A protein has these predicted regions:
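Acidic, surface-exposed loops and disordered segments
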Residues: 2-10, 14-214
Length: 214
């Protein structure tokens, strides 16, 4: 009887061993695929930072509110000194207000061109200096977050250094009141945003940009 069952038993053992080997091969292949995907994802994430450019020519179409909200959300999660969150972002998509801000920028800086390079929307970054002595740094971090998020979503941005001058004007102060904003607010930046209508290569990085002290 034992001899009768031995061939069947050996067959079952061989089948089990073969199945285990196949499963190991599948698991190994899946592991390799996952590692490869992770490497690609890491590089893609890095490319967001390495390929972002300042855009100074835009298509007239206004991006969807969904896209703009994602960029704004990224801005709200920027670091702030001691977690004070001294920054307020005013998202301007109203064309008349956008044009008014451009005119005020011309008045503050001198000039008569569109200070916003045709971008259909402007994110005004304000900071309350009564909340933090690092309000300017807080604002810079918010703009950086929004610029990188916008690039990741296929949008273009440019930092326009006009907000301080705009909101030192009487007309700028009147806008703050109209928007219901209070506090010791200072204009940090105007981050223009829209669909890019240009592309350009990265300028070479300067020598000794990074100094290592090991």
């Amino acid at each position: 009887m034992l001899r009768k069952w031995m061939p069947l038993t050996m067959t079952m053992i061989l089948l089990l061993v073969g199945a285990a080997a196949c499963q190991k091969a599948i698991t190994t292949d899946q592991s390799n695929t996952t590692e490869e995907t992770m490497r690609m994802t890491t590089q893609e994430k890095m490319d967001i930072f390495l390929t972002r450019r300042s855009i100074r020519k835009y298509k007239p179409e206004l991006p969807s509110q969904e896209l703009l909200d994602k960029v704004l959300e990224a801005g709200t999660y920027a670091p702030s000194a001691m977690g004070k969150q001294s920054v307020t972002i005013v998202a301007v998509t109203n064309r008349a207000v956008r044009d008014q801000l451009s005119q005020l920028a011309n008045k503050a800086r001198g000039g008569d061109a569109d200070q916003f390079y045709g971008a259909p929307a402007v994110f005004v970054v304000l900071a309350d200096k009564s909340l933090s002595s690092n309000y300017l740094q807080d604002g810079a971090l918010v703009v950086g977050n929004m610029q990188n998020a916008a690039h990741a979503l296929g949008l273009g941005t440019c930092w326009i250094n006009a907000a301080k001058g705009i909101f030192e004007l009487e007309e700028g102060q009147a806008l703050l009141k109209e928007w219901g904003l209070e506090g010791d607010l200072v204009g940090g930046a105007c981050c223009i945003i829209g669909y890019p209508d240009e592309s350009h290569e990265t300028a070479p990085r300067k020598d000794r940009y990074v100094i290592h002290v090991d």
